[in-house]
Amino acid sequence: MTTLEKKIEAVRVANLIIKQLTDTTDVNVLMSWGVRGHGAGYVRGRDGIEMPCLILDVSGLIHTGRVVVALNEGDDVYEVALYDVQGNRVGDWIGDVTCDMLGSLLDSLIERPKGMTDEDYKNLSEFDSFIKCLLDI
């Protein structure tokens, strides 16, 4: 595969992931991740296999940095990894992610831990907004 073909494939996969996320995840959830930018590229996943991916720059309550969603075409599933703002991977790759669970998984990694009640989330969001307001003064 030529360099141009690889770039085209990476963009195609990134657009596919974005479409699947927007089709399966509430827009308010997507907005809560504080996506500041996105891109397409290639990354070596948990098995060392090079895969096309979507790269999101996020600023959520739980994670600020990069989220990489890579398509494992051989298994037809996604692999997800988090990176801090310095570019260091945070934790292990999460594999075997299907498209129907991708949005909720990303939300639990970026913005809202699994099991958190709506009331706790609202309180945490309000506190985070208050702190950000203080820091801007």
Residue ranges with predicted function:
Residues 63-67:
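Short, surface-exposed coil-to-beta transition loops
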Residues 74-87:
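Short, surface-exposed beta-strand/strand-loop-strand elements in extracellular ectodomains
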Residues 2-61:
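Negatively charged, low-complexity tracts enriched in Asp/Glu with abundant Ser/Thr
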Residues 2-11, 87-137:
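Mixed-charge, Lys/Arg-enriched low-complexity segments
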Residues 54, 68-71, 77:
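Eukaryotic intrinsically disordered, low-complexity regulatory linkers and tails enriched in Ser/Thr/Pro
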Residues 60-62, 73-75:
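A generic beta-sheet turn/junction motif
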